[in-house]
C-alpha cells in the first residue's frame, strides 16, 4: 500500500478520557542496598510527562492537529503539573476537578534505560463524575470531526453510550481505545482499537486467523461498530469491517525499547488521519508506522510529523531516488530539506535526450545539492509539440533522465505547464533553459513568494530535439 500523509492541520479532534501524569525518576545504579537485595538508584533526573488521554492529545498536537482535551483531575499539585505539560504544545484542557480524589500519577524508576519499578497513586473516580464529564464534553461536539474516548478504566469513561449516540447523530466519528471485558459499553462507536489481550478478554482465546475474523465480525454485529482494529504486537494490526475484506498490516520491524503509550499513539494517529480526510486503510497504515516509531523511544512519548514522514519513507519505499510519483517526491523533498540540502528543480519534455540537455542539467545540479526534473507526460507533449510527438514514451524519457549522474528525482506531470507541481513542491531554486524572462516562468511566482529563487540558464547553441528529428527525416 502506498501511504500518503493528509493535511494534519485540518484535523479537529476531541479527546475525552482518563488523564494521568507519568513521572520518571532516573539515575545510575552502582550497588545493592544493605537493607534488602535491591539496587540503589541515585536519582539525578526527574521528568513529568502527560499520560493516558493527555498523551493521546499531545500526540495529535505534535502531528499538527487541532485538539481539545477533557478529563478528570484532582485539586492538587499534580493537576497543575499535568496542565502545564499539555499547555506546552498548545492544548488547553477542559478539566473537571474533583476535590476528594487525587490526579492519577504513575511513578516509574529507571536506570540504564530499564524500568525497575512502577508506583501508582490513584483512586477510582465515581460514576457521577464520569456522567458530569461526558455531559460537559457534549458542548464541544459541534467543533470537531472525530472524538477519541481513551479508556483506562479509571472512571472517566463509565457509561458512554448516550455520548457516543449523540456524537454519531452529529456526524462525528467516535474512536475508542477500550478497556475491560464489556465492549457493549461502547455500543455504536465508529471504531475500537483493542490490543490482542483486550480482544481475547472479551471474545475468548483466538485459535487462528479465521477465528479472529469470525469473532471480530461477531462484535461488529452485536455492538454496531463500523470497524475493529486489533493491534497484535509483532504480528502488526488487523482491520475488520462489515462490508470489506479484512486488512492485515505487518508490523514495522525495529528494536523495541518501551511499549508505554503505544496504544495512545495508534489511536491518536488514527484520529488525526481520519479527521484530516484519510480513508480508513490509509489511517491504519499511518497509525501502524507511528507506533513503530514510538516503541523505539523510552517512556511515554509522542511522534512528530517529520519522524512519521521519515518512517513512512523508509518502510514504504518512498525515500529513494530516480523515477518517483508526486507523493513519493513530496516525502523525499521534506527529508532533503530537513537535512539542509538545497533543492533545484527544472522541467521539460526531454523527448530525445541530447548533449545540450546533459550540459544544461549538469549546470542546474551544480547550483544545489539535489535536482528534480519534472517531465511532461505523453498527452501534454502532443498538445504542445503536435502530431508525431513524443518520439519516446514518458516512461522511457524518465528512465533515461534518471540514469544521469546529475539528476536525483524524475517526476511526471500531465498539465501543459508545471505550475501546479512546482507550487506544491516549492524548490529552493527553479531553473529554466533558454531566453525566458523570470516573470514568465511557470511556477516562478510561487517559488519566489515562498522565499526561493528563479534562474534562467543558457542552452547550448545549435542543438535541439526538433533539429535532431528534422535531420533524421532528411537523411532517410
From Swiss-Prot:
Residue segments, region Cytidylyltransferase: 345-476
Residues that hold ATP according to the record: 195-198
EC identifiers of the protein: 2.7.1.167, 2.7.7.70
GO terms of biological process kind: ADP-L-glycero-beta-D-manno-heptose biosynthetic process
The keyword Nucleotide-binding is annotated on this UniProt entry: yes
GO cellular component assignments: cytosol
Listed CDD domains: RfaE_like (cd01172)
Pathway(s) annotated for this protein in UniProt: Nucleotide-sugar biosynthesis; ADP-L-glycero-beta-D-manno-heptose biosynthesis; ADP-L-glycero-beta-D-manno-heptose from D-glycero-beta-D-manno-heptose 7-phosphate: step 1/4; Nucleotide-sugar biosynthesis; ADP-L-glycero-beta-D-manno-heptose biosynthesis; ADP-L-glycero-beta-D-manno-heptose from D-glycero-beta-D-manno-heptose 7-phosphate: step 3/4
Region (Ribokinase): 1-319
Catalytic activity: D-glycero-beta-D-manno-heptose 7-phosphate + ATP = D-glycero-beta-D-manno-heptose 1,7-bisphosphate + ADP + H(+); D-glycero-beta-D-manno-heptose 1-phosphate + ATP + H(+) = ADP-D-glycero-beta-D-manno-heptose + diphosphate
Short name of any one Pfam family annotated for the protein: CTP_transf_like
Enzyme class: transferase
Positions annotated as active site in the UniProt record: 264
Alphabetized UniProt keyword annotations: ATP-binding, Carbohydrate metabolism, Kinase, Multifunctional enzyme, Nucleotide-binding, Nucleotidyltransferase, Transferase
GO molecular function, one term: phosphotransferase activity, alcohol group as acceptor
NCBIfam families: cyt_tran_rel (TIGR00125), PRK11316.1 (NF008454), rfaE_dom_I (TIGR02198), rfaE_dom_II (TIGR02199)
Subunit structure: Homodimer.
HAMAP family per UniProt: HldE
Its job: Catalyzes the ADP transfer from ATP to D-glycero-beta-D-manno-heptose 1-phosphate, yielding ADP-D-glycero-beta-D-manno-heptose.
Protein name (Swiss-Prot/TrEMBL): Bifunctional protein HldE
Organism (species): Shewanella putrefaciens (strain CN-32 / ATCC BAA-453)
